Regions:
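Class I SAM-dependent methyltransferase SAM/SAH-binding core
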Residues: 106, 112-160
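Major-groove DNA-recognition helix of helix-turn-helix-type DNA-binding domains
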Residues: 16-40
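A short glycine-rich, Lys/Arg-flanked "PGG" loop and its adjoining helix->strand segment in the class I
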Residues: 184-199
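A conserved beta-strand element that flanks and buttresses the S-adenosyl-L-methionine
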Residues: 172
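A short, Lys/Arg-enriched interface patch at domain edges and termini
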Residues: 45-65
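Conserved class I S-adenosyl-L-methionine
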Residues: 60-100, 114-115, 138, 145, ...
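Polyanion-binding surface elements
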Residues: 1-21
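C-terminal alpha-helical "lid/dimerization" subdomain adjacent to the S-adenosyl-L-methionine
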Residues: 78-81, 201-258
Length: 261
């Protein structure tokens, strides 16, 4: 079992029990799991960590759990998130001059619209995507207050956005992939969504050991190895991948990765 994302049968094999026994365990214990449609999926790393620590709560990857968390923190998300990276990511993206007035941009895991609102004046339109209705409500409220009229919202799972292939000129995932069970799936979806010649823009933490941050912000991943992420982008089909570092308030390290389709 070398692969990271496991089926029910593979997870049961990892535990060394029958599928029937594993289903019973799944019902009675807080086994880290995620339900996609009718199918259960399990992170191998999360299962091993859960087994060794005995604490599954911080590894809970259920879609409902994540949605509930972000719905709850939506009104204070701006204050909470800015305490970690302030305006540095938005300012860096503007400084990099990668957007233009002809672009339609999709912002995945947009939250309260930190990036969507920040780049709105630079592009034709932003489609802001998030699973949390409360986050999108905050975005619309703040956009209206600022007189922003070219940001549309879409409440859906970012791994399976209901849009046609090659729909947008650029797709962003700002401080979002560390919330995902399988970032590679998300990167492949980004490749599907963006037009040939378009760009994907990701910002995220480098690998860190700040468990307090992980638990407070409901993170799944404690940052990423930049070279590993570059491999994921290349495997999805992206090319011309470039990385720049950004300063953050906690000195963990944030990178911005830009890739061409």
């Amino acid at each position: 079992l070398d692969k990271e994302i496991l089926t029910m049968e593979e997870a049961a094999e990892l535990f060394g029990v029958s599928v029937k026994t594993f289903i019973k365990l799944l019902k009675e214990e807080k086994v880290p799991a995620r339900k996609i449609g009718r199918e259960w999926r399990f992170s191998r790393k999360a299962l091993i960590d859960w087994l060794s620590s005995g604490d599954s709560q911080s590894y809970s990857l259920s879609e409902v759990d994540a949605k509930d968390f972000f719905d709850e923190v939506a009104p204070k998300w701006e204050e909470l998130s800015r305490s970690y990276y302030g305006e540095s990511i938005k300012n860096k993206l503007i400084e990099m001059n990668i957007f233009n007035k002809d672009m339609i941009v999709m912002d995945l895991g947009c939250g309260d619209g930190y990036i969507a609102r920040g780049i709105s004046k630079l592009v034709k339109k932003v489609i802001a995507v998030d699973i949390s209705g409360e986050m999108l409500k905050e975005l619309r409220k703040k956009a209206e207050k600022s007189g922003i009229t070219n940001v549309e919202t879409l409440q859906t799972q970012a791994e399976d956005v209901p849009v046609e292939d090659s729909s947008v000129d650029a797709v962003c995932a700002n401080m979002f992939l560390h919330h995902m069970e399988d970032p590679e799936v998300q990167i492949r979806e980004m490749y599907r969504i963006v037009k040939p010649g378009g760009i994907a823009v990701v910002s995220d933490y480098v690998e860190h050991s700040d468990r307090e941050l992980k638990e407070k912000m409901h993170d799944v991943w404690m940052g990423f190895n930049k070279n590993e992420m570059k491999k994921w982008f290349m495997a999805a089909g992206f090319k011309g991948i470039k990385t720049q570092m950004v300063q953050d308030a906690r000195n963990i390290g944030i990178f911005i990765m830009i890739a061409n389709k």
